[in-house]
């Protein structure tokens, strides 16, 4: 959504960074209804993202310098939502947040059932000490989120 893609164009132009996204979400980069720029109207003017350079699927590897992150397909917030798993860390985007928060599923393509499957089947299957870095808010751990989500 716009809160995660609004800087794609200037960042890519300034640095040569490639735009990577879960395969099923690639159309949303260019569709103002799916990425919510249309809903924001004037607030989103000039925030259009370029298309994807890299389409990611489960098991792909993404490198940031010497850091290797594995793609976990964690649909629910969007059909192509991904989390990135590294050694002792996971970047969860809008799938889970600290203190038991979970991603919204009321936007186009969202699915509560898929989100819960992603959380229970993939993220909560990780070791308790795995550090969680969500797309919004403070970091947490899988163990802490497992406790919060079980309430």
Regions found by a protein language model. Give the residues of each.
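Active-site HxH/HxHxD metal-binding segment of metal-dependent hydrolases
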Residues: 1-62, 147-151
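Metallo-beta-lactamase
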Residues: 35-40, 61, 67-151
């Amino acid at each position: 959504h716009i809160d995660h893609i609004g800087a794609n164009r200037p960042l890519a132009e300034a640095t040569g960074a490639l735009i990577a996204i879960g395969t099923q979400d690639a159309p949303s980069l260019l569709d103002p209804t799916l990425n919510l720029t249309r809903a924001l109207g004037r607030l989103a003017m000039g925030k259009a993202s370029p298309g994807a350079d890299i389409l990611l699927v489960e098991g792909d590897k993404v490198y940031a310098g010497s850091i290797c992150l594995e793609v976990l397909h964690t649909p629910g917030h969007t059909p192509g939502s991904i989390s990135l798993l590294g050694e002792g860390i996971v970047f969860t985007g809008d799938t889970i947040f600290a203190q038991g928060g979970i991603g919204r599923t009321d936007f186009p393509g969202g699915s509560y059932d898929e989100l819960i499957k992603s959380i229970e089947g993939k993220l909560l299957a990780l070791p308790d000490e795995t550090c969680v870095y969500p797309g919004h808010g403070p970091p947490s751990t899988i163990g802490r989120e497992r406790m919060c989500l079980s309430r």
